[in-house]
Design a protein with these regions (language model features):
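Domain-level signature for proteins that mediate thiol-based redox and metal-cofactor handling
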Residues: 1-104
Length: 104
């Protein structure tokens, strides 16, 4: 990756932070649901998971992540790959999400 694609990947990650998990009310980045973001030749590739394989919000989250990535200037196409390896756990959340969920 080049410095430009690294910067664009960082922009995509910031855009993904606007996608809120409807069940937990926190964004997918802080929840640790985004495993990888890469951009090459205007194509954003996002690898993500959900909290459980049977998550009822899976389709919504995948579509919202794709739309958020695609909305970043310089991204001409966005691919989202859903994976359950490694399996998500609450330990993957950052401190902000953990604190917000603990206060509810």
């Amino acid at each position: 990756m080049t410095a430009g694609s690294d910067a664009l990947a960082a922009e995509v990650r910031r855009a993904l932070a606007l996608v809120i998990d409807p069940e937990l009310g926190e964004n997918v980045v802080d929840l640790g649901l985004i495993y990888a973001v890469a951009v090459e030749d205007g194509v954003a590739r996002v690898e993500m998971t959900t909290t459980t394989p049977g998550c009822p919000a899976t389709a919504f989250l995948k579509e919202a992540v794709q739309a958020a990535a695609w909305g970043v200037p310089g991204v001409h196409y966005a691919e989202v790959k859903l994976t359950y390896e490694p399996k998500w756990s609450p330990a993957m959340m950052n401190e902000v999400a953990r604190r917000n969920l603990d206060s509810r």
